[in-house]
UniProtKB/Swiss-Prot annotation:
UniProt GO MF annotations: structural constituent of ribosome
Similarity comment: Belongs to the bacterial ribosomal protein bL32 family.
Name this protein carries in UniProt: Large ribosomal subunit protein bL32
Species: Helicobacter pylori (strain ATCC 700392 / 26695) (Campylobacter pylori)
Pfam families: Ribosomal_L32p (PF01783)
Signal peptide bounds: none
Cellular component terms (Gene Ontology): large ribosomal subunit
NCBIfam families on file: rpmF_bact
Keyword set, alphabetical order: Ribonucleoprotein, Ribosomal protein
Basic residues bias locations: 9-20
GO BP terms, alphabetized: translation
Domain of life from the UniProt record: Bacteria
Amino acid sequence: MAVPDRRVSKTRAAKRRTHYSVKLAKPIKAKDGTWKLPHHINKFTKEY
C-alpha cells in the first residue's frame, strides 16, 4: 500500500478541493422563447 512521503498542508489540500463543487445546470432560451435545461425535452413543444 502506498504511503505519502510528506504531509499535505491544510492550504494545499484546500486548493485541491476548490474544484470539488457541484456545477449547476444553466438554462438556455429555446426557439419559442421559453427557458429550458440543455439535453431535456420541452414540456410544451415536445422538442429535445
